[in-house]
Design a protein with these regions (language model features):
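Alpha-helical packing segments of well-folded alpha/beta enzyme cores
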Residues: 36, 40, 44, 83, ...
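Short alpha-helical scaffold segments that flank and stabilize functional sites
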Residues: 40-43, 90, 147, 199
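Glycine-rich active-site/cofactor-binding loop and its immediate structural neighborhood
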Residues: 64-124
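Basic side chains
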Residues: 15-18, 37, 74, 91, ...
Length: 202
């Protein structure tokens, strides 16, 4: 009897056993690495596709409050047409206003419903506390307490930017929708992160 394969999990496992990444580094020494890096970066940018057109940030600080040793702000800006980015910005109370301090962009990951909040040390829900305890997830808050300005953007599909699809993973839905248009969610999130830099420079 012929071998038959029905499982997509097994399919991907078998396909990857002999897979060699196209742009893996196979050289030796600094010169070879620099040439590989240039080629790999060009390929990465090609695969990411075009970034959106920038629009005026139209940034607003919706609130600014003292939170222990920190100043906690909610900022919203526009990163492109049809896309606004809510952020939490944390900075030490005694941070000089001369922009001499380093800033760190602190991004969230899964679970999608929590978004940026636990990264910024928000503890308004039991799930926030659980994520912070389990993953040491309030790293944006910790870095601000260590003297940095930190900004936590809400990445697309997470937290406030998460459309509810029931039990279906929003990342999958957004990937499929974007792929049809030749737009990738990762590219859009990188764009929003770049726009955080633009905001910090204002």
């Amino acid at each position: 009897m012929a071998n038959r394969y029905f499982s997509m999990t097994e399919y991907w496992l078998n396909r990857t056993k002999r897979w060699q990444p196209l742009m893996s580094f196979r050289g030796d020494g600094k010169e070879a690495w620099e040439a590989w890096r240039e080629e790999a970066l060009a390929k990465l940018l090609e695969l990411l596709g075009e970034f959106p057109e920038p629009v005026d940030l139209a940034a607003e600080v919706e609130y600014s409050v003292f939170d222990g040793e920190l100043i906690r702000e909610r900022v919203v800006f526009d990163s492109e047409e049809f896309a606004s980015v809510p952020c939490i910005v944390l900075r030490p109370k005694d941070m000089p206003a001369d922009r001499s301090n380093a800033a760190i962009i602190c991004c969230n990951g899964h679970p999608v419903n929590l978004g940026k909040d636990p990264v910024a040390g928000v503890r308004s829900e039991p799930e926030h506390n659980e994520a912070i305890e389990r993953m040491n997830y309030n790293y944006g808050e910790q870095l601000a307490k260590a003297g940095f300005l930190t900004i936590m953007p809400e990445l697309r599909g997470f937290g406030e930017r998460n459309d509810t699809y029931g039990r279906i993973d929003a990342c999958n839905i957004n990937y499929v929708k974007g792929s049809i248009l030749g737009i990738y969610p990762q590219t859009l999130n990188i764009w929003d992160i770049k726009r955080c830099v633009d905001y910090l420079e204002t």
